[in-house]
């Protein structure tokens, strides 16, 4: 099934946070795109990846971190550990099998934090101008 980018879904976390996402099922490993700082799933990199995944019949997950894009919350409450946990919750709920993480800018840093928790499910990582550690 081809999903339009206008078909936004929401996942409610244990504490009530509502995370907006797009998911298209398909062959694995599932591509999971992690946007950069103050970016969201409607950006050009995310939408291009989603369209290409659909064209190739690949599974793909895009999301907006809490406080970003179409997700609920205040951006000022965001932190890497919080966003990492949101990504992991969506993967646990919607993705079966191996995961290929794609991180852009700050999403590259988040990609490393998520990868630590995926262990054997991690098929690989692709960094697009990754920016781990802003200090």
Predicted regions mapped to residue ranges:
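N-terminal cap/lid segment of alpha/beta-hydrolase-fold proteins
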Residues: 2-25
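Active-site nucleophile loop of the alpha/beta-hydrolase fold
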Residues: 126-135
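Gly/Ala-rich beta-loop-alpha elbow adjacent to hydrolase catalytic centers
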Residues: 103-111
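Conserved alpha/beta-hydrolase
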Residues: 50-72
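Short beta-strand element of the alpha/beta-hydrolase
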Residues: 28-36
């Amino acid at each position: 099934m081809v999903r339009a980018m206008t078909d936004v879904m929401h996942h409610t976390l244990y504490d009530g946070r509502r995370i907006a996402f797009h998911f298209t099922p398909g062959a694995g490993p599932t591509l999971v795109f992690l946007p950069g700082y103050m970016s969201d799933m409607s950006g050009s990199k995310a939408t291009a990846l989603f369209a290409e995944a659909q064209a190739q019949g690949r599974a793909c997950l895009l999301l907006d971190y809490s406080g970003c894009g179409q997700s609920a919350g205040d951006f000022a409450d965001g932190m890497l550990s919080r966003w990492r946990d949101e990504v992991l919750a969506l993967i646990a709920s919607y993705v079966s099998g191996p995961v290929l993480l794609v991180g852009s800018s700050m999403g590259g840093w988040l990609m490393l934090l998520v990868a630590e928790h995926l262990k054997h499910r991690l098929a690989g990582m692709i960094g697009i101008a990754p920016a781990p550690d802003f200090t």
